[in-house]
Amino acid sequence: TMDFAFTAQQETLRREVRQFIAENLTDEIVEEMDIHGGADRPRGRGSDVSALFGKIRERGWLGIAYPKEYGGQGGDRVSQYIVEEEFHRAGIAITLGGSGAPAILAAGTEEQKQHYIPRLISGEITFCLGFTEPHAGADLASLRCSAVRDGEDFVINGQKMYTTAAHSATHIYLMARTDRDAKKHDGISIFIFPMDVPGITVRPLWTIQNNPTAPLGTTYGAARTNETFFDNVRVHESCLLGEENKGWRVGAMGLNLDRVGAWRYLISVSRDEDIVNWVKNNQFGDYSPAKNPAIRDKIAELWVEAQVCRLMTMRSMSIVERGDEFTYEGSAEKVWAPEHGVRITEAITQMLGPYATLLNGSPRAIDNGIFAHNVMGSFQSGINHGSVQVMRDQVARRGLGMPSSRKTTKEGAR
């Protein structure tokens, strides 16, 4: 049998987090977080946000599920989920998602674990992800960014796309080709190194969510990602994560573990709650959206889908918590949550019509343009951390034992 109830200790934690939010979180902080991002994006913030996250870190809430010997609390993933859920419902995201911490714990040396994990939890170190390239997106193993050994160093040359937070992160978690003669999945290595080493150039890449017409300080986050160039960047071999030429498995494992977490489910829930609150709290003359049977049916359907996503998240966390083999579950979660987000977007546009397209700064924008923000965000949610199409292929192969739908070749590896 499965027990879906939270423990008394977990419920106590939830009450503590709610009380903390009530006492410390302001509308101004939520707005600034919309601009600058989550807990792993510490730079570029005002003093109020910095003070808030200082208090969060003092309580150890960012590292609940990490081992005590590396600065965490040695707690369980469900408790970590509870903290993330309560903050997300209040309007801000706190997570170490995308930090590379799971991969470091699994594949790093003891020295790397001791150095990076406590500093990731404290916020002293933050990562950006250097995986995708202009010619290596869905087929990531076709990457061309090279790392050539020179004695005890590696010299890195190439380009990475969609390196979100590269302009603010202290370090990069980078995948590069270290053996051009090997099969394309075999000649890859993972490196972790500071972003201030010579030879790195970061250029902004603005997404659909950028809103240049909004009043200063009122645009929503996720508008900027980056393209990053590496020109004879020299790093020491100690920057290798895992073995040389064995980085594909490390990178894939890290991405899969990173897909386990509340954040993807909570994005869907927050969008559900946005539309539910609008429907319940608005009246247009004699017309009440909340009394429209078609709208009520659609909202109920979306709520059920959100609960399915929640259960998938909890199941994935339970598998990892027990130490069982974790193969396709993260990919399945990655398929369901973004597609649920798209269905929310479709419901928003059907209910609000042209008002769903009005951005913050428009005179008739609803709730500061949150719905337009959600609509635009849904387009990229199916691509981040692996496209939905690739995730389906992984579920078919790893979960159902079916053959791959794609051919594996060496093309693109050179």
Locations of regions flagged by a protein language model:
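FAD-binding core of flavoproteins
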Residues: 2-5, 95, 114, 118-284, ...
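Alpha-helical interface subdomain recognition
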Residues: 2-90, 94-95, 107-112, 119-124, ...
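Short, conserved phosphate-binding/catalytic loop or strand-edge motifs used
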Residues: 97-102
